[in-house]
Amino acid sequence: MLDINEMENKWKDYWFNNDVFKFRPGNKIFIIDTPPPTVSGKMHMGHAYSYPHQDFMARYMRMKGFSVYYPWGFDDNGLPTERYVEKERHVTIRNTPLDEYIKICREASRDAEKILLKNWYDLGLSCDFKNYIETSSDFSTRISQELFIDLVLNNRAYRAEAPVIRCPTCNTAISQIDMKDTEIDTDLVYINFSGIEIATTRPELLGACVALVVNPNDPRYKKIINSEVVVPLYNYTVRIISDDSIDMNFGTGAEMLCTFGDQHDLELWRKYNPGTRIIIKNDLIDDGIIIKGLSVKEARKEIIKKLKENNYLIKTERIKHSVNTHERCGTPVEIIISKQWYIKDLDIKDELLDLGNRIEWIPDYMKTRYQNWVSGLKWDWCISRQRYYGIPFPVWYCKDCGGIVLADKSELPVDPRLSGTNKRCSCGSGNLEPETDVMDTWATSSISVTLYLMHINSMNLYPADVRFQGHDIITSWAFTTILRSYLHYRDVPWKKIFISGNVYDPYGEKMSKSKGNIIEPSTIIEKYGADALRFWASTTMPGENIKIREQDLVRGRKTVIKLYNSARLVLMLSDNIKGSMDNIISQVNRWILTKFEKTLKNVTELMDGYYFSRARSELDNFFWNIFCDNYLEIIKSEIKRYPEETAAVSRFLMENIIKMYSPIMPFITEELYHEFNKDSLSVSLEKYPEYNEDYIFDGAEDFDYIIDIINKIRAIKSNMKMSMAAPISISLKGNEKIINDSAEIIKSVMHVENLKISNSDNIEIEVQ
């Protein structure tokens, strides 16, 4: 009896203790840019779906003769880690000294990593889990800071006071890649501007209005374009300007241009330069006149009250409205003016598009998302965050002249917030103050290939062969990695990028705690086994979304058991027989070898193309329908006629089936391969089967005709509720020559006592 959980635990420990997947450089090297998961939560079904994909290829390429560098890492710095630590350890920066806060974050991250390692370990990933990187480590900090200094010296990173996106909840600047569009219910407020009515969802920014904007083709406003109107309550004048971007059907077709209500405001402000009125200060609205230090909600309520009291409010109506929100917390963002660090990207869009075209996208249509993102970029990448647990900027500022002072590379890693410096500004002053911001976590994740390769002192192997990631972070992780690769190396970061879809519950719903439909990977592994979970992960094409369907997990578990039973049958049938495949005579063996080689060729081509689901389906069809249902049944008698040949062929096929399943289902295949080859270190280190034309026999597939007859007799017995081993007498019409050549096989396999054969164009069977 096979205990799947016990078996899987045995081989996990075996791989780990014997360093089976330790990277050993060779002549052919294959490098995977592994996504480093954050430590801000548990492994979820999205991980359990996407991470096996990279392991399929890692195991396959090892068997194809490559030295596979499949590294592991944790993205354990930045805002997600801070949020996790504050929740788990009940500490905040407000009541904890910075050095102590950093220490607590680091300790909590390390504790979480130990638990998370087991989650990925349980999936059967063939990483070298003994040698992983952490983005918060001194090693990663040094490299991040060094590359940042290079960008500054090459005028690709700069500090500027400019409009920037800010999250009021997270209290930090963010970048365009951190935003998502969210539809919310809000009030559309209609306001009277000296006879022209405008509609706005941000009435609290009335004191920041610097212009009114209409569409130049709107007949209602053509005559008043370029005229001036008075801003209600504030009594200053603004000009009415026109722009094609204004939707004539939204509200009244006339809008306020404020500094700044949203990204559209910023675009118009940059285009027309109407002046600036900043009233958002420290996440509060403060115009010094009407609104003084109120939150957005409080300010909105107050300004509507004042408009109503002064007869400027026409009406309000409830609408659904799309707003920019922070992807991390869902808070609507604000745009303020502040000093931040940026990496230039707007001036190299063409180069980034060219690099995207040099990468093979799997599936190809996912490249369009990257191209649309790059083409639509409107901001340089803001990389500074007003947070605490992240990569420090290796920067000081001169208090006397405002100059920027960079750390020497020999000093790295350095945290200017916690350590003094003897450096002096170029003006001669030693009166320096540290940069207190930290780098965006994407600024470190975007150099993952560099971190992994420098971890083994092998930058000469750049670029990596492939990156596996979700489609939801094409505009963040894929984009920033390509950007950094261009800026530092003028090269692609990887030759291929494989994009996976989302995971949904059995009914196609997105999983969430509020819906109560969360499914834990550990629960599935405990019930069905990791091999079954990996089988489920191989059921969709690249880029496709997937449902958690029990039938896929059941099918995976059944495949584990079927492999186990068929392997034991082959071992039993071939026991104590010295096999040989030097001269294949048996019609059955010639047929099965021809079928196998054609299957092998198809599966190999599909695996080479990263079509894991189609490859596994091809293999499933051969294993279940051809090998198990027919060949294994036939050789129970055939082995008596051709013992040496059939013993050798059956073992050859079973061993190669095990090898071909091993990238997808590594646990059961490791167990079974050791039954056939006790001295093997691992099936994953064995050679993948190679297509052999010598085993393609002319006319061998004519035996499909006999298989069709056998299946029809099976169906008859089943309909008659007869045991497959029960004797039966039949009259069989068909191709008399083909049937006579295999009559003994038909009689033996289907227990036909009396077989009457006659010629016919079609197969006809009658029970006698």
From Swiss-Prot:
Q: Which Gene3D superfamilies match?
A: HUPs, Isoleucyl-tRNA Synthetase, Domain 1
Class in the EC hierarchy, top level: ligase
Instruction: Keyword check for Phosphoprotein, yes or no.
Output: no
Pfam families reported for this sequence: Anticodon_1, tRNA-synt_1
In this chain, ATP is annotated as bound at K513
EC? 6.1.1.9
- Mind telling me which InterPro entries this protein's record contains? aa-tRNA-synth_I_CS (IPR001412), aa-tRNA-synth_Ia (IPR002300), Anticodon_Ia_Val (IPR033705), M/V/L/I-tRNA-synth_anticd-bd (IPR013155), Rossmann-like_a/b/a_fold (IPR014729), tRNAsynth_Ia_anticodon-bd (IPR009080), Val/Leu/Ile-tRNA-synth_edit (IPR009008), Valine-tRNA_ligase_type_2 (IPR022874)
- Motif span ('HIGH' region)? 37-47
Please write the reaction equations for the catalytic activity of this protein: tRNA(Val) + L-valine + ATP = L-valyl-tRNA(Val) + AMP + diphosphate
Query: Which UniProt keywords are listed?
Result: Aminoacyl-tRNA synthetase, ATP-binding, Cytoplasm, Ligase, Nucleotide-binding, Protein biosynthesis
Where in or outside the cell?
Answer: Cytoplasm
- Which processes are annotated in GO (biological process)? valyl-tRNA aminoacylation
A molecular function (GO) held by this record is: valine-tRNA ligase activity
Of the GO CC terms on this record, one is: cytosol
Per the record, the major location class is: cytoplasm
| Motif 'KMSKS' region, chain ranges | 510-514
CDD domains, from UniProt? Anticodon_Ia_Val (cd07962)
* UniProt keyword Repressor present: no
Comment block on domains = ValRS has two distinct active sites: one for aminoacylation and one for editing. The misactivated threonine is translocated from the active site to the editing site.
Question: NCBIfam families under this entry?
Answer: PRK13208.1, valS
What protein family does this chain belong to? Answer: Belongs to the class-I aminoacyl-tRNA synthetase family. ValS type 2 subfamily.
Q: What does this protein do?
A: Catalyzes the attachment of valine to tRNA(Val). As ValRS can inadvertently accommodate and process structurally similar amino acids such as threonine, to avoid such errors, it has a 'posttransfer' editing activity that hydrolyzes mischarged Thr-tRNA(Val) in a tRNA-dependent manner.
What name does UniProt use for this protein?
Valine--tRNA ligase
Source organism (scientific name): Picrophilus torridus (strain ATCC 700027 / DSM 9790 / JCM 10055 / NBRC 100828 / KAW 2/3)
